[in-house]
Design a protein with these regions (language model features):
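DNA major-groove recognition helix of helix-turn-helix/homeodomain DNA-binding modules
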Residues: 46-63
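A detector for short, charged/polar N-terminal pre-domain segments
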Residues: 1-2
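Short basic helix-loop element that most often maps to the first helix and adjoining turn
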Residues: 7-20
Length: 76
């Protein structure tokens, strides 16, 4: 699992807009924005969250930590 802050930070690292992430993940822009506004772990279905994670990892993002212990992101 990842947090909403990790999604925002990952987008910032690779300089993607919410629209770009949505298009590349094949989800709606509203879905990305809703996930990023959540507190902690986004409350979306697991499949949608998995699409976001895989898209960001394919773009070179590595998710580190856990939602409860120093969550972060870095470039691979």
């Amino acid at each position: 699992m990842i947090t909403s802050c990790q999604i925002r930070a990952a987008r910032a690292l690779i300089n993607w807009s919410a629209r770009e992430l949505a298009e590349k993940s094949k989800v709606g822009v509203a879905t990305v924005r809703r996930m990023e506004l959540a507190n902690g772990i986004p409350s979306s279905n697991a499949q949608t969250l998995d699409l976001i994670i895989k898209t960001l990892e394919k773009a070179g993002i590595e998710f580190i930590g856990t939602p409860d212990d120093k969550p972060g992101v870095r470039l691979k």
